[in-house]
Amino acid sequence: ILDVHLSDEYLETFRGTGMCVCTQLGSTAYNRSLGGAVIQEGLDLIELSEIAGIHHSKSRSLYAPIVLSKDTRVKLSSESFEKAILGVDSDVYPIDDIKEFEIRVCDQKRVRMIKGKKISYFKKLNSLF
């Protein structure tokens, strides 16, 4: 059970396996497999997608991915993250002793991509999928 706040404003109490939070670069990976949108290159956005949400009459959540401004702070909190993990790219961190954490885009750090042939973003995207 996760309480989800966006920039200190309550959004929902989520019941399910977890949440995927990504930027444009990560939108073509795990986020896409969850039914999230692929974000166009150059857009500074955050996308929040549910992982295996439980949806019935007593447990409702947004149920759809949500695209947010890069300035949005995503806070996830729970009474117990026992046996939970936080995955960041290919790294995994246990979060047993944590009650809440905040995810945000950091202006000081950017990923630099090696660029090869000049191929449009949409042609690259089309060749991947």
Spans of model-derived segments:
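Catalytic phosphate-donor-binding core of small-molecule kinases
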Residues: 1-16, 28-129
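AMP-binding/adenylate-forming core of the ANL superfamily
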Residues: 17-22
